[in-house]
């Protein structure tokens, strides 16, 4: 029988319910801090408030408070929004913080216990630039052993072993750093052995997802157990996206709620809107790809939580799905994207 490994133990896939496949509830994103524009320096250095929130929304990575998604205030705000997520029909959250993002399993376990939402934690490595010397020196064999151990044996949290339920997010820049290639290859090798799900984070270049999949597939990983994240900020042309879809992995639109006139992490492109995300997903559905689509928010800064004026983890369910229904998407198609596809991806299938 297939199972899904949550931080509180294994469950059958049908118990997951509606699932967000790419979120964070506690991580350190300070590596991506950007100095504020001189004209707004004082506003972005100030504490986030109603009078500064407009500046933070425009320049989210220029507020140090905003990218510190691990302090007590952030954790309280995240818990409040997870409870709202549950209230509006959410069942499970896949927490994608990996080595380099300072994944906090203790917090994830506490949130699972206190909210009743299923949490699935990931193993894997973020980009090379965010690794310490010990992690950055690991070989493919050592990485494979580590990922296998985190999934099979688990990690000790307050005297109990907590098992990871997938490999991810495995992140890379472009051109892909040698260490990141090792991580992708290790993920492919272990996926083949364990039958677990894998989640990839590509750089903000159209070629990156194709190269990641080549390395992963060559290492033995199954395409139908791999998610390519952040495609709504990576491949903007639908025809190119359809070409990428031929590789057989999951197509994930996971930046719902991110609507900005200036995308700080890639200033050469315009971030698409939620309306455009819906339109693109509908085009993919019409091409027969509904069984390969996933949706999420990738919340990783405070200003996206409701306590800071944001949309919270329930945004897709309360604001996006009604718009999709109004445009002709069926209940069955939504259930496929939010319930069935996540369960199929997360289920261990050796």
Curated annotation (Swiss-Prot):
GO BP terms: catabolic process
Top-level EC class as recorded in UniProt: hydrolase
Keywords, in A-Z order: Hydrolase, Metal-binding
Enzyme Commission designation: 3.1.-.-
MF GO annotations: hydrolase activity, acting on ester bonds; zinc ion binding
Keyword Hydrolase part of the UniProt annotation: yes
Cofactor requirement: a divalent metal cation
PROSITE patterns: PHOSPHOTRIESTERASE_1, PHOSPHOTRIESTERASE_2
Cofactor binding notes: Binds 2 divalent metal cations per subunit.
Protein name stated in the entry: Phosphotriesterase-related protein
The organism of origin for this protein: Drosophila ananassae (Fruit fly)
Organism taxonomic ancestry: Eukaryota, Metazoa, Ecdysozoa, Arthropoda, Hexapoda
